[in-house]
Design a protein with these regions (language model features):
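Extended, well-folded interaction surfaces typified by the phenylalanyl-tRNA synthetase beta subunit core
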Residues: 6-12, 16, 20
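Short beta-strand-to-loop capping motifs
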Residues: 7-9, 67-73, 117-123, 173-177
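Short Lys/Arg-rich amphipathic alpha-helical segments
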Residues: 12, 22, 31, 35-40
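Short, charge-patterned binding micro-sites
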Residues: 38-69
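Ordered, amphipathic secondary-structure segments that act as subunit-interaction surfaces
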Residues: 61-116
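Short amphipathic alpha-helices in soluble, non-transmembrane regions
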Residues: 78-86, 128-137, 188
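Core RNA-modification/binding signature centered on pseudouridine synthases
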Residues: 138-235
């Protein structure tokens, strides 16, 4: 049985890195007494994979990992067992069964993610910026310097900003998140304010990831669906 588990990560645990989060869930799965499948060979390990690493210091309401079990268990039972052993700040939201070959691996499916960007108290720029987002997006190109392993290169990130708008006091954005075009919300935020002539101070804002999506569309039109929606509940 292959399942996709959705969880949130808020509060102080946002400072726990990706590898430590993986290790934490491995221990939690044991405490939850789930019949997890292991790989073969001299060094067997749990068959699990996370969808998209979350940056240190970023909260999230929509994180995912896939897990192989050797028995079929109701998905609601898996959610309950895991959530009961979570630390404060981590909440298991749902479990869905996914089929190999149909839904694919969570990591390879990731195409987009959406975020909230919110200024910390007293850190919001004093200039008028709220009505400038549409003008920013109206540019045919948004060129930035992006670091690679060996150097820097100029790229156009405009095609990777699928949506950006003001929602209340927060900036909402949906960005490309596939490995080939992964676009950080920090990069978009800093580029926007730099375009306005403002250099934001360090730690001026917080970021919360809201959801992660696969793209079931084609080259002409995107059709984003949540990774959760690609699975189904099992009674």
């Amino acid at each position: 049985m292959k399942v996709r588990i959705k969880f949130s990560k808020e509060g102080p645990v946002k400072f726990v890195g990706h590898l430590d989060t993986m290790r934490y869930f491995q221990k939690a799965i044991r405490r939850a007494n789930l019949p997890v499948a292991f790989s073969g060979g001299y060094s067997p390990h749990m068959i699990m994979s996370f969808a998209a690493p979350l940056g240190v210091g970023t909260e999230s309401l929509g994180e995912y990992f896939d897990l192989e079990l050797v028995e079929t268990i109701p998905t609601s039972e898996i959610t309950r067992r895991l959530d009961e052993v979570m630390v404060e700040g981590v909440h298991v939201i749902s479990t869905r069964q996914v089929e190999d070959g149909k839904a694919g691996k969570a990591m390879s499916l990731v195409a987009a993610a959406d975020y909230y960007v919110e200024f910390r108290p007293g850190k919001e720029p004093e200039i008028s910026w709220r009505d400038k987002i549409n003008d920013f997006l109206a540019q045919p190109e948004i060129k930035v310097m992006k670091k690679t392993k060996r150097s820097e290169k100029e790229i156009d990130i405009r095609p990777f900003i699928y949506k950006m708008e003001l929602q209340g006091d927060k900036i909402f954005m949906m960005l490309a998140s596939a490995s080939a075009n992964y676009t950080k919300p920090e990069l978009v935020t800093d580029t926007f304010f730099s375009w306005l002539g403002v250099e934001l101070p360090e730690f001026a804002y917080t970021i919360k990831r809201l959801e992660v999506y696969a793209d079931k569309g084609n080259e002409e039109e995107h059709k984003f669906v949540t990774l959760e929606a690609l699975g189904e509940e099992v009674e």
